[in-house]
Each structure stands twice: as C-alpha cells, then as structure tokens.
C-alpha cells in the first residue's frame, strides 16, 4: 500500500515476481486501509510499516527515467505524506533497483523533501556494495544531512577484498 491511481496497474505488474498477482481486493489505496483490513480479519497485528519509495515513484511517474517533474513530485509527496499520516514509520529506498535507480542525488533530496527535519528515518539499500560502496555511502550521508533526518543503511557490507579496508566517510 498504497496501490491506487493512474500507475497502479503498472506498479502491480512490476511487483508480480515478488508478490505474485495482487488481486483487486488486496490493492489498498492507503496504509490506513491496509491496517484496517488486517485488523478486520482478526489478525494479531504488531508491525511497523515502511513506505517504499519505489512504490511512491511508480504511482507518481510510472517507470520514467531521470528526475521527476514538479507535478510528479507533488503527487509523490502527497502519497508519502498520506502514508506517514496513516502510520508508516519511515521511508524505504532500494537504490539498486528500478525505478529508484533513476534518481540523481539532488532528485532524491527533492523527492524526500517532506522528511526534512521530521525525524522520520530513511532506510536504504545503497546503490553499490562493491567498488562504489564508499561513494554510495557518501551519497546517503549527503541526503540525510540535507534533510536533517535519521539514516539507516541496510546490509552494510563491502563486496570484494579490495573494498575491505576502504575508509568510511564521516
């Protein structure tokens, strides 16, 4: 969730290899409607939901490349703010995967602008874990500092023996 709007079918199709076909009754328009549906089934629900930037970007712009237009950013921000208001506790990024791979660093900062000084964490799978690992970490530190928001880097690792002793940026 959310999975609604002009690009919802495109987003659902992209998710098929991960989730399988998502039947219409499980395409929730918001995080709130997802939580209500789960609670309505009597499930003992205890979870913290991250809103996926890939989902937000796809809903706003489909699989276009490059930075988002002002109209697409407005749509993305609307969905992000609604998901956070509904109870999402952070924003998840997978910068090694489409469509998030298409962001420039500045474009990423613009897309994440609603998080500025919010205390809402960015949880990221960085662009690189091999030879570009230090640059990828620098990029995310730049984003978090620009937004003045917490950063969580998932699966911190440096692939390849030549990367094992690289200095971590401060």
List the predicted regions and their residue ranges.
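Histidine/acidic residue-rich metal-binding segments in metalloenzymes
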Residues: 32-35, 39-42, 67-94, 99-170
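Divalent-metal coordination cores built from histidine and acidic residues
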Residues: 1-89
């Amino acid at each position: 969730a959310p999975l609604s709007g002009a690009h919802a079918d495109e987003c659902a199709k992209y998710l098929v290899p991960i989730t399988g076909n998502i039947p219409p009754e499980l395409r929730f328009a918001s995080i709130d409607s997802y939580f209500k549906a789960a609670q309505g089934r009597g499930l003992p629900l205890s979870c913290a939901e991250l809103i996926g930037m890939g989902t937000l970007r796809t809903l706003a712009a489909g699989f276009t490349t490059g930075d988002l237009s002002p109209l697409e950013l407005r749509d993305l921000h609307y969905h992000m703010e609604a998901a956070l208001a509904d109870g999402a506790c952070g924003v998840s990024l997978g910068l090694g995967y489409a469509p998030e791979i298409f962001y420039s660093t500045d474009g990423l900062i613009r897309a994440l602008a609603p998080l500025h000084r919010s205390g809402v964490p960015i949880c990221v799978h960085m662009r690189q874990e091999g030879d570009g690992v230090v640059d990828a970490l620098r990029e995310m530190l730049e984003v978090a500092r620009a937004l003045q928001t917490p950063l969580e880097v998932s699966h911190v690792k440096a692939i390849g023996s030549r990367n094992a002793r690289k200095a971590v940026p401060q």
